[in-house]
Swiss-Prot record:
Belongs to the aspartate/ornithine carbamoyltransferase superfamily. ATCase family. GO terms for biological process: 'de novo' pyrimidine nucleobase biosynthetic process; 'de novo' UMP biosynthetic process; amino acid metabolic process. It catalyses: carbamoyl phosphate + L-aspartate = N-carbamoyl-L-aspartate + phosphate + H(+). Carbamoyl phosphate binds at residues 49-50, 99, 127, 130, 261-262. This is Aspartate carbamoyltransferase catalytic subunit. Heterododecamer (2C3:3R2) of six catalytic PyrB chains organized as two trimers (C3), and six regulatory PyrI chains organized as three dimers (R2). It comes from Porphyromonas gingivalis (strain ATCC BAA-308 / W83). PROSITE patterns: CARBAMOYLTRANSFERASE (PS00097). Catalyzes the condensation of carbamoyl phosphate and aspartate to form carbamoyl aspartate and inorganic phosphate, the committed step in the de novo pyrimidine nucleotide biosynthesis pathway. It holds the Pfam family OTCace. InterPro entries: Asp/Orn_carbamoyltranf_P-bd, Asp/Orn_carbamoylTrfase, Asp/Orn_carbamoylTrfase_sf, Asp_carbamoyltransf, Asp_carbamoyltransf_Asp/Orn-bd.
Length: 304
């Protein structure tokens, strides 16, 4: 694959190949496979984990980084079009990693770029590198990607990690439990996707032990203030679901709690020391997965 802009472009074989390669990087992340390569990280929207893990991935692979983490320092503030920005950066870099606030921006960038483009998140649309690290974390903790029940909790309307994970898991016979208030319920297009792909799901507004005790993966999300135009609506729903340690007491032994981070208050700090809390390790898995993604789009072979 020259570009990775959406998880739906990845077949099951593509996903498993990327995850298998990530395992090699977990065993040895310091492989100088990008010697002489320049990678541009263009972050038009704030990021901590995604940007730092991509930049760490490049550094550990021996490449060099150019770009920006604040769009106000770029020529976009002068009115430069995305097309011109991508075309210009493509003159200097071998790979572009981009986060943008507009849905579809990454796909457009891939259409006008002469070098590979990796989508690091575009609006409320897609976040394929997060999905791949989520899949890596699920396989690592469950021993398989197949036949898992995944409860997705919180902001299912704007949560691009949710949307991407539904599509990414569709190859592996999942069952879903969607937990959200009406204002943040899963968009109809993703419910239709589940129906078209014979993916069983249930919906509920209630986050309780009945949900927690019947899933293998509990995928928590924050309510994203930056997606709201009505702050009163945000205040009304931001704390509607909070996971506490006591709520995990009767959960399945194999249950793991995932979260794309940052958390705001939806996971209490008393959960952190529970062995079922996996979200910090999940973030570390992003390093290995993103090293694998970089090698995928650049066509770099990785030896055992």
């Amino acid at each position: 694959m020259k570009h990775i802009v959406s998880i739906d472009q990845c077949s099951a074989e593509d996903i498993l190949r990327i995850l298998d390669r990530a395992e090699l990087f977990e065993k040895n992340p310091n492989r100088h496979l990008l010697e002489g390569k320049v990678v541009a990280t263009l972050f038009f929207e704030p990021s901590t984990r995604t940007r730092l893990s991509f930049e760490t991935a490049v550094n550990r692979l021996g490449g060099r980084i150019i770009g920006f983490s604040d769009a106000s320092t770029s020529s976009s503030t002068k009115g430069e079009s995305l097309k011109d920005t991508i075309s210009m950066v493509g003159n200097y870099a071998d790979l572009i990693i981009m986060r943008h606030y507009l849905e579809g921006a990454a796909r457009y960038a891939s259409e006008v770029s002469r070098v590979p483009v990796v989508n690091a998140g575009d609006g409320a649309n897609q976040h394929p590198s997060q999905t791949l690290l989520d899949l890596y974390s699920i396989r690592k903790t469950q021993g398989t990607l197949y036949d898992r029940t995944i409860a997705m909790v919180g902001d299912l309307k704007y949560g691009r990690t949710i949307h991407s994970l539904i599509e990414g898991m569709s190859h592996f016979r999942p069952r879903f439990i969607f937990v959200a208030p009406e204002e943040l319920s899963l968009p109809e297009e993703y419910k239709q996707f589940c129906r078209e792909h014979d993916l069983p799901y249930t919906e509920t507004k209630h986050f309780d032990e009945e949900v927690i005790n019947n899933c293998d993966i509990l995928y928590m999300t924050r309510v994203q203030r930056e997606r709201f135009t009505d702050l009163e609506e945000y205040e009304r729903v931001k704390d509607v679901y909070v996971l506490t340690n006591a709520m995990l007491s009767d959960s399945r032994p194999n249950l793991r709690v995932l979260h794309p981070l940052p958390r705001v208050g939806e996971i209490a700090y008393d959960v952190d020391d529970n062995p079922k809390a996996y979200f910090i390790r999940q973030a570390l898995n992003g390093l290995y997965t993103r090293q694998s993604i970089i090698c995928e789009v650049l066509g770099i072979d990785v030896a055992n």
